[in-house]
């Protein structure tokens, strides 16, 4: 924008094409465009565009992957007075019908960062959320022994923007969930193994305040994907993916409360089989943001629970709360550990 007016929103990224014949990967999704800046005197920043989804592998050629998703665009910043734009969300990773251990579903796109608030006044924009990882959509029946495809990792959340002279910091985006691993085996196959679940994405950092304003909350870590099932005698389920890590809360302004820390995501469950797969570990929580002069510290995030399985996953550690203001304010509480 020029002197007065809002910045334009960024365009969305296009979806990747599907792969429908023979061996090959789904196409990658396009990235979202960045939002425009607000006017020199007054105006909000534009929102970033969302990332495009990754294309799927549909035909199921051996070793074929799902396409990676596009990332969200950054939110535009305000200049003097106005709010920052929100970051765009990441696209979802493409699924795969590939029937081999080296087939991998597409990774989810990362969320874009939020724009900053105006120098004089304005709240900062929130970070975009990470996209979910793709999943396996077919059962592997060949190989010695058959092994399922791997689920895609979730994308990470974008960071919240920083506030201006007065205003709150932006909230961090949440991570995207991990995709599910593929099933493997037939009734008479021996020793088949389910595919691994994808890891959950991490949350984005909370943005800071300036003079008057709260820090933004940190983003939440996402759940890990479940492992695929093993089929037949002596089969083993796939291991669950790890939960994503929470992100730290933002620092408060001189007067204001610190942002709460994001919680960790739960680990994915191990797949079924004659022997179940192991559960994924839960993600750790993140520390709360500190207050500065007057205000309370943000609460710390709790750890995610471990997934179920032959060996259950370990719960993530909870994190400490932020410190209270030096003149007045209480510290934040400590987040609970995951089980």
Tell me what each language-model feature is.
Residues 1-338:
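Collagen triple-helix signature
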